[in-house]
Amino acid sequence: MSAIKETIDISRTPEEVFSYVTDPTHLPEWQESAVRVRRLSEEPIAVGSKVSVTRRMGRRETTMTMQVIELDPPRSWHVHGIDGPVRGDVQGRIEPIDDGTHSRLTLAVDFEGHGIGKVLVPLVVRPHVRKEMPEDELTLKGILEAGAAR
C-alpha cells in the first residue's frame, strides 16, 4: 500500500515549522492519537535519536519506539518505528513559499504490520490515520500561526 500523504500551507518560516514538528514533545499538542512521548536519547534530536510514543486508537493504547533515520534542517526528516506490532514510517518535507516567509508542509505516513499488526494496519490503523491526518495538520497550522511555537 502507498503512504498516506497530506500537505498544508502554514504562515510561518520553514525554520519555525521544522523546529516545532521535529520536537517530539509537541506531538500530543497537535496529533489527536498521541497520548505520551518520552525521549529515549539525549537532546538535541539527531539521526539515531529514539523516542517512545504512546498512541490511542479507539479504546486501546499502544507504545512504539520511533528512531530518526534522516534529518535535514529545515527541509526534511524521516522517522521509523523499530518495535511493536504496528511500526510507523513518517517522512516530512517543508518547502519555503512566499519568499520563505511561509511554508508548505507535506507529511507522508506508512506502516509495517508485525504479528497482529498485519491485521490491524489495513483494518484499523490506516483508516484511522486517513481520517486523523487532515485534522492534525489543521491543528498544527493553528498552533503555529497563533505563535505558540516561538
Give short role names for the model-derived ranges:
Residues M1-S41, A46, T139, A148-R150:
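Hydrophobic ligand-binding cavity/cleft-lining segments
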Residues T7-S11, R38, Q67, R93, ...:
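Generic structural detector for well-ordered beta-strands
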Residues A3-K5, E61-T65, R87-Q91:
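Short, surface-exposed coil-to-beta transition loops
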Residues P14-E15, E42-I45, E70-P74, R93-R104:
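A short, structured loop/turn motif at beta-sheet edges
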Residues S2, V47-S49, R60, V86, ...:
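Residue-level preference for beta-strand/loop junctions
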Residues H78-E135, L140-G142:
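Beta-strand/loop substructures that line and gate deep hydrophobic ligand-binding cavities in soluble
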Residues R56-T62, G113-I116:
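Short, cysteine-centered beta-strand-loop-beta hairpins and adjacent loop/turn segments enriched
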